[in-house]
Amino acid sequence: MNLNKMYGLFLRHFYLIKSSLPRVLDLIYWPTIQIILWGFISKFFSIYSDYYNNTLGIILTCAILYDILFRSSISFNMLFLEEIWSRNFTNLFIAPLKLKEIIISLIFTALIRTLIGLVPAIILTSPLFGVSILKLGFPLFILFLSLYIFGITLGLFVSSGLMRYGPSFENIAWSSLFLLAPLGCIYYPIEILPEFFKVIAKGLPLVYIFDETRNILINGLVDYENIKPAYLLNLVYLIFGIGLFYLSFLRARIKGTLINMGE
């Protein structure tokens, strides 16, 4: 594994972001708008609802955590789409880069994009709504890491589809997370779901992460045993995602679709 090659690919995408104000604004705009929107919705419920006392803090914190998942997955996909749109996809795989080096570079670049988008939104929540996600303390890192891993895994799935089917698979990149959101039990407990959907939801790491988030915020206690299933599922999906990425690359290379990508 060559660190210089991975660093070179990282720099390529980093300078694309750094040299383009619209790209930076795009990274900041959506999470900021989402946090502000959900902040006002949460504030409404905190005034007019007796469901639980800390409605604002719970819903807004869950919204921020969901955006970690959303940003990480979309950022990974965007890096792949950038290569397609700039017609650099073929050059990427002609370059003396191993697939694992490409994956690792994209993972770290996606992390930078995610943080650029989320940090301003997180900072705004405290003066606007009196909510700070940082009050979660160390458990925040555990929750963040799990959501980031799952986001990257979804990115691997979508990127595999882009390699296999080309730009026509692009719509899946934008819709995949919205399809999972209702089953992820982000803003409500799993008990709300019908029995059939509960079975599916239990196979998603999101359910365990957001359930424990609500537990921490409501009871002030953290139970790491409740988070373990999320990490076990993440491990299974990540291994499968990496395997699918390699398989899609091999099939695309055999069929020659990598050459025509982006044309």
Task: Specify the residue positions occupied by each region the protein language model found.
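Hydrophobic transmembrane alpha-helices and immediately adjacent juxtamembrane helices
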Residues: M1-E263
